[in-house]
Amino acid sequence: MAKIGNIEHVEERVESELMPPSMYKVVLNNDDYTPMDFVIEVLQVFFRKNEQEATDIMLTIHHQGKGICGIFPFGIAETKVIQVNQFARQNQHPLLCSLEKA
């Protein structure tokens, strides 16, 4: 405690530990109508996957019903979901992108 004039100044140190942000998986879900080439394009454009990575994820989506495009903090994941869903609708595809807690 320090005294400045007639005022006592109390200095308290509070140590806080920053917690890492909650992470979310961005998932593409399979449907019977969206062309495989369009899914690959989405993976390359929105998730920066190379052709081989995009093809592998697309095949996982096709065979297992869904595939993980990436894991991001909530704000980024939410933005990517919105962008992908808007892009799919603009191109008349029912492709669905969603979030899952990692």
From Swiss-Prot:
Please name the HAMAP family in this protein's record: ClpS
Task: Supply the source organism for this entry.
Answer: Shewanella baltica (strain OS155 / ATCC BAA-1091)
Concerning its family, UniProt says: Belongs to the ClpS family.
Q: How does it assemble?
A: Binds to the N-terminal domain of the chaperone ClpA.
Q: Where are the transmembrane segments?
A: none
**Which InterPro entries does this chain map to?**
ClpS (IPR022935), ClpS_core (IPR003769), Ribosomal_bL12_C/ClpS-like (IPR014719)
Q: What does this protein do?
A: Involved in the modulation of the specificity of the ClpAP-mediated ATP-dependent protein degradation.
| Protein name, as recorded | ATP-dependent Clp protease adapter protein ClpS
